[in-house]
Design a protein with these regions (language model features):
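Phosphate-end processing signature that detects enzymes handling 5′-triphosphorylated RNA
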Residues: 1-135
């Protein structure tokens, strides 16, 4: 994943550490210069455009709220990351978060790249998802 956050540029890769639990991953981050970021950004390929917001839902505990743009502009997903398995196992999702899609390979980030609402509608109907339009 190629990311820009203000004047910080990164190339991120997630590695699955478990074949049975998609939430157990290692993230490798390569810090880029602005020039390196621009080089990767101009490459052809499937892309996702989104704005990420950090929300402190408990003291010291943050959720990352992804508001998608372009063809997926109706989609909002929330990501929770944990320091260890005990924290993950003791987590209770906030009531405003409706479904846990962690183990759903049809909604994994790589799968969403290059897709539109119409493309993934059949995959998300099982969640009775209501599109969220922000103005």
């Amino acid at each position: 994943r190629l990311r820009k956050n203000g004047e910080t540029f990164e190339l991120t890769k997630k590695l699955a550490l478990s074949t049975t639990d998609a939430s157990i991953q290692e993230e490798q981050i390569l810090v880029l210069t602005a020039e390196e970021y621009q080089f990767f950004a101009q490459l052809e390929g499937k892309k996702i455009h989104k704005t990420r917001y950090r929300y402190e839902y408990l003291p010291g505990e943050f959720a990352e709220i992804d508001v998608f743009q372009s063809a997926l502009s109706w989609l909002v997903l929330v990501d929770f990351e944990f320091q260890d398995l005990a924290q993950k196992d003791n987590f209770s999702k906030p009531e405003r978060c409706w479904w846990d899609i962690t183990q759903d390979a049809t909604i994994a980030w790589g799968i969403l790249a290059g897709k539109s609402y119409q493309d993934i509608l059949p995959l998300i109907q099982k969640y009775d998802y209501t599109p969220l339009f922000l103005t």
